[in-house]
Amino acid sequence: MIYKKYGRTGKEISVIGFGGMRFPKEGESYDYDKCAEFVVKANDLGVNYFDTAPGYNDDHSEFIMANAFKKMSKPFYVSTKSNDRDGAKLREQLETSLRRMNLEKINFFHIWCILDMDDYKSRMVKGGAYETALKAKEEGLIEHIVFSTHCTGDEIETIVNDDCFEGMTVGYNILNFPFRQKGLQAAYKKGLGVATMNPLGGGIIPQKADYFDFIRGEDDETVVDAALKFNASHKEITTVLAGMGSMEEVLYNCRVGDNLESLDADKLKDIEGRLFNSMDKLCTGCRYCEYCPKKIPVSKYMLSYNNHILGDTQGIFNNLKWHWGIKPEVVKECIECGLCERKCTQHLPIISRLKEIDEFSLTYK
């Protein structure tokens, strides 16, 4: 397993991290012992970063992790989260997570799912989430305060420049990399560790392997290899979180972490060029369309619409709700001025896609 330094923390983190929200159900419940076997095996194979959160797997993930931690023989680090804005509620959630996982401290505690700058400011108010986490750190209950976000690259840059955090977790993959690249670079420049989630686009990339076959290089056996390598080869990225819901997935993902050959800057630029040239129907997140006179966040709608093109219409509304906290009815504000379409580098039919999203919202939620 390859290891990278997590920012300035001094910790060496496995390039593949264990994402703890893909455990399989056995009927209507989770077999804690069976799921824990995946976690233990990953640790045996060198994974030392384990990411979980309240609510993952119907709120069972932290319990599964606890089952695994007591059986693991190699050192490991734990990442969990709270999305509470209220300081007292965050403290309660932190103590619950510690108790559930039988831990004295959380290594990486996330101010979780910052949606936009207004949301960020709400976490930073006096007596709020961040200040409470800082006090818990002083007490030794938290080792490193980090954040997770679905913000734009510009917004991420603003957050990291406030110098309040030691690391971040951010969605980053071949579908959205232009949307977040600036934030990634800003975090690296500031010395933050970076974990990336959704490296496989929430499963879309392997499900549509034929569509994305163009990203494979000469040494890549599969599209999944190429997608994981794309993330892990960025110097700015410390660890790539991969959900592992079977022993086969554990073995596969760890093999990628064992055999990773870093891509140099020229090769990464080549891949990025192929992505832009090949995804002619998909929004690449360049954000040239952002100057809507009605303040519609067009790029976020178009990135969400990518899910429909790839066969997952429900994914539009999952993204809007959980990634950005946007209501689908905002598209009704469109006055069809065409400014966004004139700015679009992909020449996408943005207006008609906004109308489709409005129509889909009658069926999907």
Describe the residue ranges of each PLM region.
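Conserved residues at the C-terminal ends of beta-strands
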Residues: 19, 53, 109-112, 148, ...
